[in-house]
Amino acid sequence: FAENLNFFFNYQLSYMYWRYFLWNFVGRQSDIQPTDAIITDGNWLSGIKWIDELYLGPQDNLPDEIANNKGRNTYYFLPFLLGLIGLIYQLNRDPRNFSIVMWLFVMMGIALVVYFNTSPNEPRERDYVYAGSFYAFCIWIGLGVLAVRDLIVWATRRKGLMAPIAATVVCMVVPGILAAQNWDDHDRSHRTMARDIGWNYLQSVLPNAIVINYGDNDTFPLWFNQEVDGVRPD
């Protein structure tokens, strides 16, 4: 029983959920899927040196393939902190709707961890499974902007357009750093491998042939080629 609890908290909950959560709102070490918990791959990373060193050790003089990995994205806790501000703001201002968002956050996150009962050594990262939970936290990030606006109104004793404009400008740092850090590893320009594979499949068969492929990953390119590009609809 103790081993099962240890596996649940340390692997299923911490490694396979909270690590993904921190990827999105704190930062990510690399886009390399780790094996056997290798400390140089796939962890969360904030960009704040002393915090990262507590968890990952010294971050100086790293090999080029680690230090310059395009998936190495650091947000300095800014999205997380703005979301936390929004969470507290909604809890104080609107507890009823807070409970709705909180239930969405829990049911699409921690509850799914329990439901799926993730096995060790997954073939790929499973962060996409918990996207609903991350969306819920993004609601709090949005409400965090309102909290900053109210703080500016309280500090300046002025209402009107100045406070929301100032709050928007200040909080644009968050989407700004997300865009700046993620653009290079999320840019899909000139990545045509999936489309090319589907095209090759379809061009290799006789008219009106039946194509038998391997699972969903091979099916999606075929659908795209046929339904969007109009390649070999026969």
Task: Show the residue positions of the predicted features.
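Signature aromatic-anchored transmembrane alpha helix within multi-pass, membrane-resident enzymes
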Residues: 95, 143-179
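Hydrophobic/aromatic-rich transmembrane helices and adjacent perimembrane loops
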Residues: 122-146
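Membrane-interface helix-loop-helix junctions at transmembrane boundaries of multi-pass membrane enzymes
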Residues: 84-103
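Short periplasmic/luminal acceptor-recognition loop of GT-C membrane glycosyltransferases, typified by
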Residues: 209-224
